[in-house]
């Protein structure tokens, strides 16, 4: 059995000792941390989710190690605080003096839900989106990046043009990575992407809704190239987007492979 620690004894802090190899570490910290998170949703409510966190800082060449426990302490401090992109960026800024670091990155990947009304019946249901927030802090400056994967329907223009009836269509994932400046309206970015698919998706549809989405997609055919170009054009015009990358993957219903395209801007 371990003996109780005598408070008069000074325990050695090995990780704070000097390192003689003189090699800087660009990123060191913790990752794969599942931790509760409150996110301020588009309607202003606090949405409870579970995020997969990565917290890292740069370590100077002369220092042996960083203070790993302080990353978890930072998560605990904000566990009950509803998060906005601005507060998330502040959390990354706060991490630097806590770890005695000049640079650091904070990443949270989490499922996010939006309550949607079906297009005809109006029946409501949740739809989930995969979201990643990243804040890169250097001194007093913080760069915030939003990454969101939005599922949509795509219908092939060529298939429609050559067929007497019908056209092959499929579910597609459009992933936007955007460095944001100023106000960040995550729901608005999701809505922007959904508007550019052949049709958006819903969690629950009645028969009149199914008729609508079938005909909506048929009237709005798009190649994977159309998807990324149309979303990119909208992002270029967005006042809060500094730079972006748009990826689209169509899970082809007539092939055992996907169609894929990327636009960076």
From Swiss-Prot:
Alphabetically sorted, this entry's keywords are: Hydrolase
Q: Which Pfam families match?
A: GCHY-1 (PF02649)
Give the pathway annotation: Cofactor biosynthesis; 7,8-dihydroneopterin triphosphate biosynthesis; 7,8-dihydroneopterin triphosphate from GTP: step 1/1
Q: Which Gene3D superfamilies match?
A: Urate Oxidase (3.10.270.10)
Name the residues annotated as site: May be catalytically important. Answer: 156
Alphabetically, the GO molecular function entries are:
GTP cyclohydrolase I activity
- Reply yes or no: does the keyword Transmembrane apply: no
E.C. code: 3.5.4.16
Q: Which domain of life is it from?
A: Bacteria
Tell me which Gene Ontology terms the entry assigns under biological process. Answer: tetrahydrofolate biosynthetic process
Q: Which catalysed reactions does the entry list for this protein? A: GTP + H2O = 7,8-dihydroneopterin 3'-triphosphate + formate + H(+)
- Family listed: Belongs to the GTP cyclohydrolase IV family.
Cited function? Converts GTP to 7,8-dihydroneopterin triphosphate.
According to UniProt, the name of this protein is GTP cyclohydrolase FolE2
